[in-house]
């Protein structure tokens, strides 16, 4: 259990509660969660964050009516800056998007601007939104994370409780290496409902070599851990930085979609540029 799982800031969320679905535009459906909830226990404040980054959302179930009442569909791409006061709670985001379904908008640009304005207000930070017509995306290949996959190891695991113990003494030698490691075994659980969240993770670093078995055991230990996607990525970044002390570090996770949304947070202390193609499970 996360130390803040029962925090009063989470009391008003619709997540985990019976909810009415509205199909007429209602910006009040959006709900934010303070990023400070997970950052404070990690000793991170707005003026000492060791990373930059964003939360990348893909909106697969986005539809509205044009001025003549004809339904429109698009795939949305949202980037929420890491400096925002709040992250966006995903169920509220889904309910908010549903409220577009029977609402008329004059132009696609009006829809984009509406999304951007409302998300900025909820997050209290910088947000960018792009809308894609389906023919722009058709035929795009399934992408893959560049790097060495560490999943195929002949090891036995019987502990699935989160711990940073595996990262202690996880580096060896004085030689500096630069490598990108990938795992598809990341599984955590929703902070509120405890439903499983499935993800692939890419860890790119320069520094003393990280023991791959210990790193994999650490990632697998998230299996019973309850936090939102964004919080898990920041925890992983902070833990690796703290225990392994690489010179540079980038952590990027792409999670499977739920409710027509996927969330793909990344954090880095270098000039990392995330690839945004969807992975095989997305």
Curated annotation (Swiss-Prot):
Active-site residues annotated for this sequence: 190 (thioimide intermediate), 197 (proton donor)
Catalytic activity reported: 7-aminomethyl-7-carbaguanine + 2 NADP(+) = 7-cyano-7-deazaguanine + 2 NADPH + 3 H(+)
GO cellular component terms, semicolon-separated: cytoplasm
Pfam families (UniProt xref): QueF (PF14489), QueF_N (PF14819)
Record flagged with keyword Protein transport: no
One MF term in the entry's GO annotations: preQ1 synthase activity
EC number(s) per entry: 1.7.1.13
Any single biological process term in GO: queuosine biosynthetic process
Pathway(s) this gene product operates in, as recorded in its UniProt entry: tRNA modification; tRNA-queuosine biosynthesis
Binding residues annotated for NADPH, in chain numbering: 90-91, 258-259
Location within or outside the cell: Cytoplasm
Keyword Lipid metabolism: no
InterPro entries attached to this UniProt entry: GTP-CH-I_C/QueF, NADPH_dep_7-cyano-7-deazaG_red, QueF, QueF_N, QueF_type2
Binding-site positions, substrate: 88-90, 229-230
Subunit structure as annotated in this protein's UniProt entry: Homodimer.
Family: Belongs to the GTP cyclohydrolase I family. QueF type 2 subfamily.
NCBIfam families, alphabetized: QueF
HAMAP family, per the entry: QueF_type2 (MF_00817)
Purpose: Catalyzes the NADPH-dependent reduction of 7-cyano-7-deazaguanine (preQ0) to 7-aminomethyl-7-deazaguanine (preQ1).
Stated name of the protein: NADPH-dependent 7-cyano-7-deazaguanine reductase
Organism for this UniProt entry: Salmonella paratyphi B (strain ATCC BAA-1250 / SPB7)
């Amino acid at each position: 259990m996360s130390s803040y799982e029962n925090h009063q800031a989470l009391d008003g969320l619709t997540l985990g509660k019976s909810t009415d679905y509205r199909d007429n535009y209602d910006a009040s459906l959006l709900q934010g969660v303070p990023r400070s909830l997970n950052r404070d226990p990690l000793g991170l404040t707005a003026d000492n964050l060791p990373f930059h980054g964003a939360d990348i959302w893909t909106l697969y179930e986005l539809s509205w009516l044009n001025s003549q009442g004809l339904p429109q569909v698009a795939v949305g791409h949202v980037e929420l800056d890491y400096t925002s006061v709040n992250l966006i709670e995903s169920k509220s985001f889904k309910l908010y998007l549903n409220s577009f379904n029977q609402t008329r908008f004059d132009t696609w640009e009006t829809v984009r601007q509406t999304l951007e304005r409302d998300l900025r207000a909820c997050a209290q930070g910088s947000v960018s939104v792009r809308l894609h017509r389906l023919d722009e995306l058709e035929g795009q290949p399934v992408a893959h994370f560049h790097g060495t996959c560490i999943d195929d190891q002949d090891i036995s695991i019987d502990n699935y409780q989160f711990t940073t113990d595996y990262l202690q003494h996880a580096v060896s030698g004085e030689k500096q290496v630069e490598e990108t490691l990938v795992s598809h075994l990341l599984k955590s659980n929703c902070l509120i409902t405890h439903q499983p969240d499935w993800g692939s993770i890419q860890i790119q670093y320069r520094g003393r070599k990280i023991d791959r078995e210990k790193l994999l055991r650490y990632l697998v230990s998230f299996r019973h851990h309850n936090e939102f996607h964004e919080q898990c990525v920041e925890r992983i970044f902070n833990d690796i930085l703290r225990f392994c002390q690489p010179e540079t570090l980038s952590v990027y996770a792409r999670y499977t979609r739920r409710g027509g949304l996927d969330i793909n947070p990344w954090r880095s202390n270098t000039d990392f540029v995330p690839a945004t193609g969807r992975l095989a499970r997305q």
